[in-house]
Amino acid sequence: MGSRYPSHQLSNGLFVSGRPEQPKERAPTMSAVAMPYTGGDIKRSGELGKMFDIPADGTKSRKSGPIPGAPSRSGSFAGTAQSGPGAPMATGRMSGSLASAGSVSMKKTNSGPLSKHGEPLKKSSGPQSGGVTRQNSGSIPILPATGLITSGPITSGPLNSSGAPRKVSGPLDSSGLMKSHMPTVVHNQAVTTLGPEDDFSCLKSFPKPVLWLVVLIFIMGFLAGGFILGAVHNPILLVVVAILFTVVAALFIWNICWGRRGITDFIARYPDADLRTAKNGQHVKVTGVVTCGNVPLESSFHRVPRCVYTSTCLYEYRGWGSKPANSSHRHFTWGLRSSERHVVDFYISDFQSGLRALVKTGSGAKVTPLVDDSVVIDFKQGSEQVSPDFVRWLGKKNLTSDDRIMRLKEGYIKEGSTVSVIGVVQRNDNVLMIVPSSEPLAAGWQWRRCTFPTSLEGIVLRCEDSSNVDAIPV
């Protein structure tokens, strides 16, 4: 008996209504490899790397032309791209127009010749499938190896455009990044550069009119004593003047040699103030542990990082036929040939109150440093105990040794050192600061050391040699 509705029999013998289903082409099965961990490497991040125009690893090969054994698939698409190093086919840039509607084959097309790393030598931009056009104008920004997009040009900082450390001249060590950063730090306005005139000297604060008056009195005394000795043959006046001259000369020599020791004793006896009760504008002495501010320093010779004060001075001894180190260098004395002394703002944690204060020693502030030298190296050409580090440092600074007798002195205050600071308290918007004083601090006579009265200008920094002492970690 016929029926208006068509029916068909299934494979199990059951009759159902409707026409039999047309056999469909089975969709191709594509296997995918699990993406490995890239570790943040932008060169191994597939599509993100292509977006920023970064080539893949050189070990991956690129192929041009149709994929062998790729089945056709219905739909409109412009090709596929596999990302990551685990894909069976390496990534490539798509250029040109691919077939749109209908059954098309999956293709990857690279235009132009390939380099030895499998990378197109010439990038081309053109219309994509589906009428979508991609145009690149100008240079595409390059990401560092970390894949982080940050503000500012990529050339600023210790990394180059590929994310690797910048190459600097000289031997490479663990502080290579700081070496490339040091020239910008030294010329920073926040760094105070100290000269020879900023160093402490007892004779610098001695009144010059008094000094010349004493010299004039002794000259007149010697002339009068010599005249009396020649006229009446009486040497008493000449002997008295000679004894007084010897005493005064010995006192001056003593102050030149031991005047610094006297002023350090004065600072040690100066009472520490409590920052909690210190008034605004009060002269205080604070002792505590220092912490670097925004601009840390590095010593020139030993490359000690994270310092708040550095001093590297090269001296030369001028003999009878030696060359002068500077224009005012006299014979048979040590003259300053090279000086690198810098200080910046830093923080100090007071031992008594526990408060943290900002010490304003940077930005051209007046500072009187009393820091012991951590390194003293004597150099003489032809000596068997010549330091190779010292010779290398001379070459880096473009300083010749010749046959000169030289001495290198380096001192520094590194982070975590214990420092005594004398300055004026200033409170500004709940920020506790120690700033330079407008008037010098008078030390007066130091009878225990037999030193002349002297004065200390600006902020006084006192730190003993801490090269052999472990700094407090901060």
Curated annotation (Swiss-Prot):
It is found in: Membrane. It is a multi-pass membrane protein. Keywords: Membrane, Phosphoprotein, Transmembrane, Transmembrane helix. The modification Phosphoserine is found at residues 45, 169. Its main location: membrane. Residues 1-137 are annotated as: Disordered. Residues 1-14, 73-83, 97-113, 125-137 have a biased composition (Polar residues). GO terms for biological process: negative regulation of cellulose biosynthetic process. PANTHER family: OS08G0230200 PROTEIN (PTHR33709:SF4), OSJNBA0035M09.9 PROTEIN (PTHR33709). This is Uncharacterized membrane protein At1g16860.
